[in-house]
Amino acid sequence: MTETTAVVLAAGKGTRMKSELPKVLFPVLGRAMIHWVLDALQSAGIRQIIVVVGYRAELVRQELSGRGVDFAVQSEQLGTGHAVQMCKPLLEKGDNPVLVVAGDSPMIQASSVRELIEEFKAGSFDCLLGTLIKDNPFGLGR
């Protein structure tokens, strides 16, 4: 099995934010939130990262210039599954595992990413889903 590829979903508008700025570009501690996600993935040892862009793609591309990521374009926002499908041409090079994460999850930790990848590689899985157990899940999973 080859190295893990990460797909970062960053095509959405972030309608609830009531702004023209793509949600992944909102600042968190002085940086666009997507940088925290990319930092965690790269710290976990992931070398190939595909960022799916759509809404105001040029702003996201500009923000991420120099980060060494590849881009896939989701011209029409038709959901998460469709966004991942847009990566197919970049993923057909092998049978390596693919980790799909949201670009608006700045709290993701490299240790969690590493553990998920290790669990996947140790088992015989077609799919492995990382989840979170919360004492109070109110507001999650809209």
Label every model-predicted segment.
Residues 88, 95, 132-142:
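Rossmann-like NAD(P)H-binding beta-loop-alpha module
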Residues 111-139:
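Conserved donor-nucleotide/metal-binding helix-loop-beta segment in metal-dependent transferases, i.e.
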Residues 17, 25, 60, 64:
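Short clusters of hydrophobic/aromatic residues that line enzyme substrate/ligand-binding pockets
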Residues 2-5, 31-118, 122:
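Conserved N-terminal catalytic core of the sugar/cofactor nucleotidyltransferase
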Residues 20-36:
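Short catalytic helix/loop segments, enriched in acidic residues and glycine
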Residues 25, 71, 127-129:
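Conserved beta-strand scaffold positions in the cores of enzyme catalytic domains, especially
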Residues 9-11, 52, 100-102, 129-133:
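Short beta-strand segments
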Residues 1-19:
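N-terminal nucleotide-binding beta1-loop-alpha1 segment
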